[in-house]
C-alpha cells in the first residue's frame, strides 16, 4: 500500500516535470496590474514551471524509488 502511494506520487511529479508546453504569463498592461490576485491557472503554471528547475532532484528520487522497489517492496 505504501509502495503504491509512493509510486503514484513519483509518477505524478515526473509527469509535471517533463511537460514541454510553453507556459506563458499574461502580458502586463501597466503598473496597476501587479495588484491583482493570481488566478488558479496562474498558480498551476507557476508550480509546473518550478518543477522544471528540480529535474535533477526528481531524477535522483527516481533512482532511489527504483532501489526501494527492488529491495524493500519486491517479493
Curated annotation (Swiss-Prot):
Subcellular location: Membrane
TM region positions: 54-74
Keywords, comma-separated and alphabetical: Membrane, Signal, Transmembrane, Transmembrane helix
Membrane topology type: Single-pass type I membrane protein
Signal peptide: 1-17
Extracellular side: 18-53
GO cellular component, one term: membrane
Family statement: Belongs to the SMIM7 family.
Name listed for the protein in its UniProt record: Small integral membrane protein 7-B
